[in-house]
Design a protein with these regions (language model features):
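Electropositive, glycine- and tryptophan-enriched low-complexity nucleic-acid-binding patches
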Residues: 43-89
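A contiguous, basic/glycine-rich beta-loop/short-helix subdomain that forms a polymer-engagement track
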Residues: 5-45
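Charge-patterned, long linear interaction tracts outside catalytic cores
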Residues: 170-195
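Short glycine-rich phosphate-binding loop at a beta-alpha junction
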Residues: 93-100
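Helix-centered, glycine/charged polyanion-binding patches within enzymatic domains
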Residues: 101-173
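Flexible loop/turn segments at secondary-structure boundaries
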Residues: 38-39, 63-65, 72-74, 103-108, ...
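Structured core elements
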Residues: 30, 55-57, 64, 98, ...
Length: 195
């Protein structure tokens, strides 16, 4: 395994040197974890992170993994996956979705409208003049965005208290298991606290 990684790194580096490229697709960035890809972030102090990227849903405080990948995927393309996962788990569609602005693409808005699912993203276009209905909608959106902020807090809590921050496994399968078990552990603790 290690020898294959070294050989692949050599091939990639040689290709970059010969063709005078600055980057290459699926570039290996870790000798021991050749499946890991860099994930560019917009966070302060951390421009690039390495590891798995997980798309989560939060239902009644429980975190559920809808999509897990070591590749840098665009979250906005995975909204249908999350809705399908919800429907499989609960045998119904969600009434509403509290989501980040990145999910507010025209395709996603159209998809949610077709499924009669309310979304907590701002409407496209100009805001209507002093309309009572639009004010109520804005208040509802703000309330749902506060719920979404709880998800961010739950992720931070899971990184600190449930070993999601430091994954100590050595291959892709065990790393996925580690992440799933950390989420499971968090959800069990939450269920026990609610009893």
């Amino acid at each position: 395994m290690l020898f294959r990684s070294v050989k692949k790194i050599y091939t990639q580096q040689k290709e970059m040197y010969d063709e005078k490229k600055k980057s290459i697709a699926a570039r290996i960035v870790s000798l021991h974890k050749s499946y890991v890809r860099p994930i560019v972030r917009g966070k302060n102090g951390k421009n690039v992170e390495f590891g798995a990227k997980v798309q989560l849903s939060c239902v009644d405080g429980y975190l559920l993994a809808d999509h897990l990948s070591f590749d840098n995927f665009n979250e906005s393309t995975k909204l249908e996956t999350s809705v399908d996962s919800f429907q499989r788990r609960f045998d119904k569609l969600p009434e509403h979705i509290a989501m980040d602005q990145i999910y507010g693409s025209r395709e996603n808005r159209k998809y949610l409208a077709e499924k009669n699912i309310r979304a907590s993203v701002k409407a496209l276009g100009r805001r209507p003049k002093n309309d009572g209905a639009s004010d109520a909608e804005a208040r509802w959106r703000k309330r749902k965005q506060r719920e979404r902020n709880r998800i961010e807090g739950a992720i931070g809590n899971s990184k600190t208290n449930h070993d999601l921050g430091i994954v100590r496994s050595k291959n892709a399968k065990t790393e996925q298991s580690w992440i799933q078990m950390a989420l499971f552990s968090r959800n069990i603790m939450l269920a026990a606290a609610k009893m």
